[in-house]
Design a protein with these regions (language model features):
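N-terminal carbohydrate-binding/catalytic regions of secreted carbohydrate-active enzymes
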Residues: 59, 63-114
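Eukaryote-skewed repeat-based solenoidal scaffolds used as protein-protein interaction platforms
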Residues: 133, 137-140, 144, 158, ...
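Long, well-ordered core segments of solenoidal/helical folds
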Residues: 64-77, 135-152, 204-223, 275-292
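Bacterial N-terminal signal peptides
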Residues: 16-26
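Sec/Tat signal peptide C-region and signal peptidase I cleavage site
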Residues: 27-31
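Terminal, non-catalytic domain-edge segments
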Residues: 32-65, 184-209, 235-242, 246, ...
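Bacterial N-terminal signal peptides that target proteins for export
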Residues: 3-18
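A cross-kingdom feature marking solvent-exposed beta-strand/loop segments within repeated
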Residues: 87-108, 151-170, 235-247
Length: 393
């Protein structure tokens, strides 16, 4: 999972990718390529460890990118996370990926699986190559096969290599990404109009289970609806933490991504309407005013296990600052939840170790666009009134 600020827009990026793909499919085959925005998170993580000094295919080279996705796809139909599908593969790279085909590991983390399925279907429509549709179908089968029966979400990774990876996961679009994919398939939106009616019906049933689960997972404080945790026990559906520094909490960033998805539903049910309104009100109630997050350059670069840092971060009092949100909020009292890798909660941002302070996003402006623009527009579309109850003009 990532705390990187470049992925704050959550499902908006996925929607942008889908829109760009639809435009590409409407034009001459292969003229402009297909959007690769959906792979940004994977590429970011790949380059964090390996740098960016390696040859990459041009974004317009659809066949080369799709062929890489075929090469990276495991025999079970899924993919491991954090690979760059635009990488120009050496003979050694190809040999290694072929040798890994039979390995069991796969992951839905960091916008994985649903992005590959969409790209491969787009490549099929553009090129007519049946192997791309077949690979997308295997990927979809993998996604459907790993949907929890107890509640229609997905685990972080299969098989789990750490305790948190077996949990039902909302973080990093592990939930909202597949739901968006399933909705687009069930509604036969391009490029998924190339799927048959049986596949669309299967996707629609999985979508219904997923949306029902999503509403069940929304955290309540008494009778008040709030946001969503990052992970849950798949049997009891109790909120849980992730990695050692990701304690059990309501997660503002993931709540925004979930709301982006729920607000995309054309004709929402009363339950969805109540869910969106409750979560938006909670986000407004927990916003932090009078503070800004400042980046401070370091005299020398600091090397850590998972990243190198040329800066530190600090919270600075500023009466004119835009609202901030803590990433994590206490389920009981909505106080910000901060912690170190040892799993110990701390009270202040400056008590977080520099490695986690620079390698994770503890504060951000995640809900600003949603509250200022997207939620009011949704309210007018669905309810016909402003937040003050006045008719929309």
């Amino acid at each position: 999972m990532t705390g990187s600020a470049r992925f704050q827009k959550g499902i908006r990026r996925w929607a942008a990718s889908a829109a760009a793909m639809a435009l590409a499919l409407a034009g001459p085959a292969g003229a402009d390529g297909l959007s690769v925005i959906g792979f940004d998170d994977a590429v970011h993580h790949w380059q964090l460890k390996r740098g960016s000094d390696y040859p990459r295919h041009d974004e317009s080279d659809v066949r080369a990118i799709a062929d890489n996705l075929l090469l990276m796809q495991r025999n079970h139909g899924g993919w491991v996370q954090n690979r760059d599908p635009l990488q120009v593969m050496s003979a050694g790279d190809v040999k290694q990926l072929l040798a890994e085909k039979g390995e069991t590991q796969g992951s839905f983390d960091n916008r994985n699986v649903f992005t590959q399925i969409e790209y491969l279907m787009g490549a099929f429509v553009l090129t007519g190559e049946q192997q791309y549709r077949e690979a997308a179908t295997r990927g979809l089968d993998y996604l459907l096969r790993n949907q929890f029966e107890t509640c229609g979400g997905w685990p972080h990774s299969v098989p789990a290599q750490a305790a948190y990876q077996s949990r039902l996961t909302v973080a990093d679009e592990v939930f909202s990404g597949p739901l968006t994919l399933l909705r687009r398939i069930s509604e036969a939106r391009a490029p998924f109009d190339a799927f048959d009616a049986e596949t669309r019906a299967t996707a629609k049933a999985a979508l219904a289970r997923g949306e029902d689960c999503l509403l069940r997972l929304q955290v309540r404080q008494g009778d008040t609806l709030t946001g969503w945790a990052g992970q849950y026990d798949p049997m009891t559906l109790a909120p849980m933490g992730g990695r050692t520094f990701e304690l059990t909490a309501i997660v503002s960033q993931e709540t925004v991504a979930i709301l982006d998805y729920l607000m995309s539903i054309e004709s929402p049910s009363p339950e969805v309407i109540a869910s969106v309104a409750g979560a938006a009100e909670w986000l407004r109630a927990v916003q932090i005013e009078g503070w800004r997050l400042e980046t401070v350059p370091l005299q020398s670069e600091q090397a850590y296990r998972y990243h190198n840092a040329k800066f530190d971060r600090q919270l600075v009092a500023d009466p004119g600052a835009r609202p901030l949100w803590a990433r994590f909020y206490d389920i009981a009292d909505n106080t910000p939840v901060l912690a170190n890798r040892d799993g110990m909660r701390v009270e202040r941002f400056d008590q977080i170790d520099p490695e986690r302070r620079t390698g994770y996003s503890w504060y951000g402006n995640w809900a600003s666009t949603l509250l200022d623009r997207d939620f009011p527009a949704w309210r007018c579309r669905v309810l016909g009134t402003t937040s003050e109850g006045a008719p929309c003009t």
